Every structure is written in structure tokens, then in C-alpha cells.
Amino acid sequence: MQSRWLLLKNPPDHTRLRGLVHKAFTPRIVDQMRQQIQSITDRLLDAVQGDGQADLVAALAYPLPVTVIAAMLGIPAQDHDQFHVWSDDLARSLDLTDEPEVYNRAGRSAVALTDYLREIVARRRREPGADLLTALVQAEEAGGRLSEDELYATCALLLVAGHETTINLIGNGTLALLRHPDQLQRLRERPELIETAVEELLRYDSPVQLTSRLTLDRVETAPLPCLGPEVGS
């Protein structure tokens, strides 16, 4: 599954897949997503409002992204916990590790997630809904559509890419604001700065600190030679 992720593709496949996925994010879908995110966030915060204190990661940062993505894809609420498990397993496989079990678990979860999505996609073809998955199924550009395998891979990528990054952004960003109370107070007084603040927090303490890549051509960096796909950086 991972080999079909848009994130790991080069042109022209990357360009084609990106265009098709972009088609699915229509203004209607984006507005619907915004409403879903607000509703889910409010519900999670309401659940701990009267407690006096809360674990930010456990109460909000961890459950929010997968719940939102699953809802956007039209996944029934009773299956959201299973999506958390699959997302965790797949996300861990992106770390640089030499533990075989990490990749074994990711492989098993990829198979289970694909089997699950196969049924959901078939249902959306028969009964289109007002959700992102239906939009992905129906997305078309230059006469082309996502293949079945590309659909499953794209759904999995949305799940994984939005999971760990959002958890880390909420945690890192909140910690940064607590360490700089003047900036926190400024944001409280001027909530219209929130979008700029999020962009700056992404830059200041990035949710992803490292990623691996394989070079396709011979390049030199610092000043070591990288000899095409033989060397990762």
C-alpha cells in the first residue's frame, strides 16, 4: 500500500495523483470538513471542561485527527477506534527503525485497512454520500480516475499524514505558547492572528523533524556524494 502513496511518487505519477486528489477537495467538501472539525473539537473539549485539568494529548491531540479524517471519509463512529490502531501502526513504520515487528504490524494493518476500505468504497459506488470518500471515488481529471488500489492508498495516506503531524502540532504549539506567555496573551487578544500563528508554530517546532529520501540522480551534499537510489538521505 505505502508504495502507492502520493507522498512517495515522482512525476508524472505524482502529478496525476495530486491532480485527482485536489479535485476531491471541492469548496463544499472543504466547508463540510471545517464544520466537522469544529464540531468534533467542541465535543472533545466539552468532555473535559468540568474536570479542572486534562491531559492535552490524550483528551484532544490524539483523538482529534483520526476522528476527523474517519468522519470525512464517512466511516461509522463505531469503527473510529480501529482506525486509531491502524493509523498508529502505519505511522510508526515511517520512523527510522530496525525493529522488524514495527514493519510486520504495519503490513498487517495495511492489509486489514485495505479490506475494510474495499467494502466502504464499493458501498460508496452504489450509494454516493456527501463525504470526502465519495468525492475521491468520483474525482476525474483529463478522463482519468483513481484506480481501486490508488483509492485505498490515498485514504490510508490521509489517515496517516494527518495523524501524527496534527498530534505533534497541537502538543508542540501549546507548549511553545505556554513557554512564551506574551505571545499566548497576544493571540487571546487578537484571535484573527490564529492562522499566522499556526504557520509560525509549524516553522518554529516542526511536527516532523526528519524524513528519509532516496536520490534518483547523482548529487553531492555537504560534500558527500549520493549515488542515486543506493544512498538514502
Across the structure, where does each feature detected by a protein language model lie?
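Cytochrome P450
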Residues: M1-S233
